[in-house]
């Protein structure tokens, strides 16, 4: 067990996972799914949850039996050795320069909607968000969990308020009959919606900080997954009911438009604040997870700067290093005005590759029906890589490159290189 402070309970874990899954997607993905699949997207959410369940269960069982700040990298190391563990860790960290600045831009975009910010003002908002992540992170996982549980409650409250004010009744939900489902539209929606469930790998890094990881980590993961899926489905119903989607409308503008329609322009700030907090929650759990991964990877040298914990058993040095990388990436991307859309797709391929490595580790570490679920999850990950298409080559090249280029490490006990 790691030296990190064990302070997370079940409710806090549910709040952490549900907000990490909702994140930037809750304001945008339901509108995108409605655009590509129409009413078929109402069936796509339960189908997607069923497909993700094998992967989630494998994460839950591995996290219960092998809780570690190393997350997926730790599972892979136990199954295939320390070299692939390091490769997996660096593969996860390689998302920092692309994924986090993109999420920062989305979060700062709500400031643009509220105050008309542009250019340097948005940059200051992004840097301010990182400062807030640092402040919360130095207070420990419990502080992050408490905040994100509140954010999860606000997101749910917003959707419930829209349902109530919009007088949406179950009889009004336009569920297509099973025989009328268009498979082409369903598959198109699934390919868009999968990214809402990227976040399980980040949550795995917090398993060792639960008070009772064997009992509460799997429960938090499964309940958080179902809660996030229910919120996404509820958002999709709202978007379809108010016809708040289209090729000429920004996907992230759908819920704010509905809020203004129901509650007036004065309520726009409510949607923007909740949207910002949802983005912040996703950013926060990823940055805290990256910090714990960096800390765990530095444990081969306990005297290393990054391997040290604060007096409160928090990896502050690793957190500072991760945030430093985020600041540099944000400044470079702002200066060069880089378009991140294509790069995010490449990053998504890396996430699927990490999921696949976790499933392969599960095939080796687990027994019985859980091993079978790991096999099913692995096949689903291969299918998802195929759906990404040729852009998945980026993840494969990164994996091969890290395997070849990472220097071999000598273990002090026997001098064996890994």
From Swiss-Prot:
UniProt catalytic activity: L-methionine(in) + H(+)(out) = L-methionine(out) + H(+)(in); L-leucine(in) + H(+)(out) = L-leucine(out) + H(+)(in); L-isoleucine(in) + H(+)(out) = L-isoleucine(out) + H(+)(in); L-valine(in) + H(+)(out) = L-valine(out) + H(+)(in)
Activity regulation as described: Efflux of L-methionine is inhibited by the proton ionophore carbonyl cyanide m-chlorophenylhydrazone (CCCP).
Periplasmic side: 1-15, 63-89, 135-147, 204-219, 279-317, 363-378
Effect of residue 24 to Y: Strong decrease in methionine efflux
GO cellular component: plasma membrane
Effect of deleting the gene: Deletion increases the susceptibility to DL-ethionine, DL-norleucine and DL-norvaline. Deletion also results in intracellular accumulation and a reduced rate of export of methionine in the presence of extracellular Met-Met dipeptides.
Entry's induction text: Induced in the presence of intracellular L-methionine, L-leucine or L-isoleucine.
Membrane-crossing segments per the record: 16-36, 42-62, 90-110, 114-134, 148-168, 183-203, 220-240, 258-278, 318-338, 342-362, 379-399
Function: Catalyzes the efflux of L-methionine, L-leucine, L-isoleucine and L-valine. Activity is dependent on electrochemical potential.
Family: Belongs to the amino acid-polyamine-organocation (APC) superfamily. Amino acid efflux (AAE) (TC 2.A.3.13) family.
Name of the featured protein: L-methionine/branched-chain amino acid exporter YjeH
Species name: Escherichia coli (strain K12)
This protein's encoding gene: yjeH
């Amino acid at each position: 067990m790691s030296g990190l402070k064990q302070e997370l309970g079940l409710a806090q874990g549910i709040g952490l996972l549900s907000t990490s899954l909702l994140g930037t997607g809750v304001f945008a993905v339901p509108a995108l799914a409605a655009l590509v699949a129409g009413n078929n997207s109402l069936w796509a959410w339960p189908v997607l949850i069923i497909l993700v369940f094998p992967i989630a269960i494998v994460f839950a069982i591995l996290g219960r039996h092998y809780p570690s700040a190393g997350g997926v990298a730790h599972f892979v190391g136990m199954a295939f050795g320390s070299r692939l563990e390091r490769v997996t860790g660096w593969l996860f960290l390689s998302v920092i320069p692309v994924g986090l600045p993109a999420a920062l831009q989305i979060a700062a975009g709500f400031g643009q909607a509220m105050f008309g910010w542009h250019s340097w003002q948005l940059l200051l908002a992004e840097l301010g968000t990182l400062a807030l992540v640092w402040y919360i992170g130095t207070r420990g996982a419990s502080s992050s969990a408490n905040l994100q549980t509140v954010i999860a409650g606000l997101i749910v409250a917003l959707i419930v308020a829209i349902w109530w004010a919009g007088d949406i009744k179950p009889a009004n939900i336009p569920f297509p009959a099973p025989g009328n489902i268009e498979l082409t539209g369903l598959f198109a929606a699934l390919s868009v919606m999968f990214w809402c469930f990227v976040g399980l790998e980040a949550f795995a890094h917090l398993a060792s900080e639960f008070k009772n990881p064997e009992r509460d980590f799997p429960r938090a993961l499964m309940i958080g997954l179902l809660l996030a899926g229910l919120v996404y489905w509820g958002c999709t119903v709202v978007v379809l009911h108010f016809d708040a989607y289209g090729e000429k409308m920004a996907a992230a503008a759908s819920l704010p438009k509905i809020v203004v329609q129901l509650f007036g322009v004065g309520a726009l700030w409510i949607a923007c604040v909740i949207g910002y907090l949802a983005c912040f929650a996703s950013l926060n759990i990823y940055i805290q997870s990256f910090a714990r991964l960096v800390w765990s990877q530095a444990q081969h040298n306990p005297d290393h700067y990054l391997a040290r914990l604060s007096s409160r058993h928090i990896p502050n040095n690793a957190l500072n290093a991760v945030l430093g990388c985020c600041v540099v990436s944000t400044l470079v991307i702002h200066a060069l005005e880089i378009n991140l859309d294509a790069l995010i797709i490449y990053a998504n391929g890396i996430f699927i590759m990490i999921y696949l490595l976790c499933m392969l580790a599960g095939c080796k570490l687990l027994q019985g029906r859980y091993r079978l679920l790991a096999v099913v999850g692995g096949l689903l990950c291969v299918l998802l890589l195929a759906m990404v298409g040729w852009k998945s080559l980026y993840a494969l090249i990164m994996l091969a490159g890290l395997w070849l280029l990472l220097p071999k490490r000598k273990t002090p006990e026997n001098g064996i290189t890994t």
